[in-house]
Amino acid sequence: SNPHKITTTPDYSIADAKLLLKQTIHDNWQEVGYSADPSSSSISYNNKVVTVNGADCYVFSCSGKTFAVAVKLSAVYYAHNGEYQPLTFNNTNYLFK
């Protein structure tokens, strides 16, 4: 059993996850390595769900990069060197004090 599993939040739709990803890319595009904000570009769902840090995540592509958005909208990750790196809560210690 996973003590961190979110049980009170519904699974959100792919469309909702895409909106969160669009905003997250808009807020963090330089951090991901883009030379300009691609959030208005096409973001496409890859018809795939992966597990990252114990959470089911929808997989999306945008301007040559791959992202994973937790179905509970609890986190956004981007694929970097074969691993998913957190794009939300990545520069904070909020969860680890």
Segments (PLM) and residue ranges:
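Extended hydrophobic/Leu-rich segments
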Residues: 1-6, 17, 21, 50-52, ...
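Short, flexible coil/linker elements and helix-boundary hinge sites characteristic
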Residues: 33, 47-48, 82, 91
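Exposed beta-strand-loop-beta-strand "reactive/processing" segments of non-cytosolic proteins
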Residues: 37-76
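A short, surface-exposed interaction/processing loop segment used at functional sites
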Residues: 1, 67-97
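Short, non-transmembrane alpha-helical segments in secretory-pathway proteins
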Residues: 3-44
